[in-house]
C-alpha cells in the first residue's frame, strides 16, 4: 500500500491547528498515512517559529514527507511570516492553516506557492491577565472546538487534506493541488452538511457569532486600555463563543432527532466512508 507522509507544525494555538492531524486518522488505524508533529506550544515569536520549522525540515530529510502543514494564528504576523518564507523556500509542498488575519496575506501566500486554509470563525480569545487563567482558556477552546466540529468546519478541513493525501498517493503534489480555502458562515450554503434547514441556519448563526468574537477580543486586548472597560469586553467575547457553541450543539441535536447526522469515517486504506442513519454501516 502506498503511504502518504506529512509533517504538521503547530506554533501558537488555533482550534483548527490543534486538531488538523487528528482529523485525518480519528481511530489511529489508517495504514495509508504517516505523520510527524512538531511545535512550540502557544509561542509564535519569530525565534520559536524558526526553530520549529528548522526542526521540521531536519526531520524531513529522512522522513521525506509529501507535504508540510503549518498551523497557527495570524499568518501575517512576524513569526508565521518567517514560517511562510522558510516553507516557500523549501522543496516541499506546504499549506498554511490560519484565521481571519491571514486574509491580509492571501495573495502573498499564492505568490509564494503555498496552499492555505483560513478559518474565519477560529477566533482569538480574550487574553487579558485579569480575566484569562488556564481554566478559562480551556473552557473557551472547548466551546470553540464544538463550534468548528458541530458546524462542519472541521469536515471541510478533513476533506481538503484527504484530497491532498490521495494526490500524494497517486503522484507528486503540484502547486495547483494545494488547497486555497477561506471558510466562513456561507461555506455551509455550498455543502450538504445538514439535512434539516433549521439545523443549517443554527450552524450558520454559530459561525457568524464565532467570527465576530475575534473583533471583540482584539478590541479588548489591543485597543481598549482602561481596565474597567477591557475586562468586561474580553469576557463578553467568551460569552459570545459560549452561545455559539450552544447553537452549534442545537444544530447537531436537530440532526440527531431526524437520525440524519453525517459521519465520514476513514477506512484503513484511507477511503472516506459516509453514512447518516445511526445503525447503518458507512459506505
Swiss-Prot record:
Coiled coil: none annotated. Its EC number is 1.5.98.1. NCBIfam families: PRK00994.1 (NF002162). Strictly dependent on the presence of salts for activity. Gene3D superfamilies: 6.10.140.120, F420-dependent methylenetetrahydromethanopterin dehydrogenase (MTD). It comes from Methanopyrus kandleri (strain AV19 / DSM 6324 / JCM 9639 / NBRC 100938). InterPro entries: MTD, MTD_sf. This is F420-dependent methylenetetrahydromethanopterin dehydrogenase. GO terms for molecular function: ferredoxin hydrogenase activity; methylenetetrahydromethanopterin dehydrogenase activity. Homohexamer composed of a trimer of dimers. Pathway: One-carbon metabolism; methanogenesis from CO(2); 5,10-methylene-5,6,7,8-tetrahydromethanopterin from 5,10-methenyl-5,6,7,8-tetrahydromethanopterin (coenzyme F420 route): step 1/1. The lineage of its organism: Archaea, Methanobacteriati, Methanobacteriota, Methanomada group, Methanopyri. Keywords: Methanogenesis, One-carbon metabolism, Oxidoreductase. GO terms for biological process: methanogenesis, from carbon dioxide; one-carbon metabolic process. It catalyses: 5,10-methylenetetrahydromethanopterin + oxidized coenzyme F420-(gamma-L-Glu)(n) + 2 H(+) = 5,10-methenyl-5,6,7,8-tetrahydromethanopterin + reduced coenzyme F420-(gamma-L-Glu)(n). Belongs to the MTD family. Residues 255-283 are annotated as: Disordered.
